[in-house]
Amino acid sequence: MSVALLDINDCNLQLWGADSAVQSPGYALLEGKDYRFGTAARSSARLRPRDINNRFWWQLSTEPLQPALGPARHTADLVHAHLQQVHREAGQPAELLLACSGSMQREQLSLLLGIAQHCPFTAVGLVNRSALLGSLLGGRGRLFHLELQLHQALLTVLQDTGDEVSVQRSVPLPGCGLLQLQERLVEVAASAFIRQTRFDPRRQASTEQSLYDVLPTALQALASQPETNIEVSGYRARVSAADMTAAGQRLITAATDAMGAMQATDRIIADPLVALLPGLQDSFSQLSVADANALWLAAQQHGDHLVNREGSVSFVTHLP
């Protein structure tokens, strides 16, 4: 497929092209009268909380920005600036296929397409990211897609007839977003530091930020071993997967309730990020983890079927 793919999930926007893949979390940091986005902004979240906005994708609108953050009038201005930065970092591809979550409202999708018209690329397609993923990993029966966003989780229910995968509904899981999960995981890790070393990394913004920064590496280690060490500011604490499991219980319970009674042919697909949560895979026997580049592979599989260079772009929610 000659068109680049932009996966819009505020935990980590990803833009794939023929020769590159760019990642950029949905964080904006005010620097003077300008903004920094992505990993650089996220690494300042605990250090400069008043200069950070991480809600601009979730609350995409043209309502006045509250609280104010520099020259941006509304979250749409921040989305516009973030899109331009990601596009530049990816080598400025001429055309983009946009993959969006089912939690985005119709008005937000329309606004997003309007914003794209003021960017140096052409949006030639708009597809539900769960439908795109399901078309690659499908099989007959019900398919559930579990994804993490910064401020909530989302469970999307799909139906696969063998000929077509279609989105049936999307169920937000409030209080189960990445930020809430991080807070619970950090609390567990900080308790381990206090218990083992009497050092509390949450006492200072710099060490608290360091703890947040090393958390993903710790979770990756716990995916393959029962315990791991976390080091912050010269102090080291040992944490176990069993310790961390309680942090994800709210998400596991909410997802279980949203899926209802499971059938033998049902399948669950989890994004790689949510699959790092200790205890998740043990809780769902029918769960498989999507590859990190699964959406890009699915887009390439469909080729130009998803591309519309003539007329208006519509949100695709079912795919062969």
Language-model region placement:
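Conserved phosphate-binding loops in N-terminal lobes of ATP-dependent enzymes
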Residues: 11-99, 219-226
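Helical "lid/coupling" subdomains associated with nucleotide-phosphate turnover
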Residues: 218-320
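Phosphate-binding glycine-rich/basic clefts of nucleotide- and phosphate-handling proteins
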Residues: 160-243, 266-277
